[in-house]
Amino acid sequence: MAANDRAAAPGKSGGSSGADGLMRASLSAVAPGTALRDGLERILRGNTGGLIVLGSDKTVEAMCTGGFVLDVEFTATRLRELCKLDGGIVLSSDLSKILRAGVQLVPDPMIPTEETGTRHRTADRVSKQVGFPVVSVSQSMRLVALYVDGMRRVLEDSAAILSRANQALATLERYKLRLDEVAGTLSALEIEDLVTVRDVSAVAQRLEMVRRIATEIAEYVVELGTDGRLLALQLDELIAGVEPERELVVRDYVPEPTAKRSRTVDQALYELDALTHAELLELATVAKALGYTGSPEALDSAVSPRGFRLLAKVPRLPGAIIDRLVEHFGGLQKLLAASVDDLQTVDGVGEARARSVREGLSRLAESSILERYV
């Protein structure tokens, strides 16, 4: 198999988060443009079925009876021809070799499964028992199903996936446009020191919505393989800087810890991620995830940023210097009022860097105000 035709080997699952990662790796291994996907499509076109285990270890070997050992290089045509035999096929863990063919796979019959067909029931049980992905090709239904540690995914053709992906991309473009609007408003309000919890929650809400739709599109990119290259480029362009912005907003506004309530940046990001779609639509719930009380009245409470987000927009300013500036001055308003001499009192900030920070903040302040009122 040519190196550029082979996707990364999926490996074995390791818990719920591991199963999700294994599913993504497995989808990548069977995506259009890979030799394995080519072989699966040849099986469908030949109107035959197949049962293929994507990996091997002692557990898989103990489950196999009959058939014969091959240990030959994987090719799409070999896979197609060997699937004409009764029985399953076992590939090496890196998908580079066909190890066995024509084998009968005998998983534990006590493993529960909701599948009905013999081939699909076997595939589901084998994947659960051994931890490797298993592909089942149905001759009668003409579909390919991927089983990964209790999860099932039917492989679709690129046209169907692209249709959904393009709809999601159009939604992402609208979300990103709205995000840019509320983020610009927040910047202007920060300069004027007029920010409320509602303003912060609106930006955090939009950032999370953009992140979620981008994650969905990224899944489509994985499934599309080589057919998703253009989609991947569009996605990268649209979400550039979104993830860092999300963390910067939280770092700017997560409340200072008190005796009754304390929340770290990581905790706030986790809480935002854990919100359901319905909860994300409520600004009060978003505010609560950030660490505020979440009452409707609290949304109009005034808050002040620490300055991480605006300082990150200053060119060529290292993160370590940003942290020192925020720690020294304590808030954005004091940073905006600081002179070049004041800035030089911070460790690591010389005259040239102090002038760069001073001029950068001044330009950001002017442009933010102009964008809001002009």
Curated annotation (Swiss-Prot):
ATP binds at G87, L105, T118, R119, H120, R121, T122. GO terms for biological process: DNA repair. Its EC number is 2.7.7.85. Its cofactor is Mg(2+). Residues 20-158 form the DAC domain. It comes from the Bacteria. PROSITE patterns: DAC. One of its GO terms (molecular function) is hydrolase activity. It is an enzyme of class 2 (transferase). It holds the Pfam family HHH. Signal peptide: none annotated. InterPro entries: DisA, DisA_sf, DNA_integrity_DisA_N_sf, DNA_integrity_scan_DisA_link, DNA_integrity_scan_DisA_N, DNA_integrity_scanning_protein, HhH_motif, RuvA_2-like. It catalyses: 2 ATP = 3',3'-c-di-AMP + 2 diphosphate. SUPFAM superfamilies: RuvA domain 2-like, YojJ-like. Keywords: ATP-binding, DNA damage, DNA repair, DNA-binding, Magnesium, Nucleotide-binding, Nucleotidyltransferase, Transferase. Homooctamer. NCBIfam families: PRK13482.1. HAMAP family: DisA. Belongs to the DisA family. Participates in a DNA-damage check-point that is active prior to asymmetric division when DNA is damaged. DisA forms globular foci that rapidly scan along the chromosomes during sporulation, searching for lesions. When a lesion is present, DisA pauses at the lesion site. This triggers a cellular response that culminates in a temporary block in sporulation initiation. This is DNA integrity scanning protein DisA. It comes from Streptomyces avermitilis (strain ATCC 31267 / DSM 46492 / JCM 5070 / NBRC 14893 / NCIMB 12804 / NRRL 8165 / MA-4680).
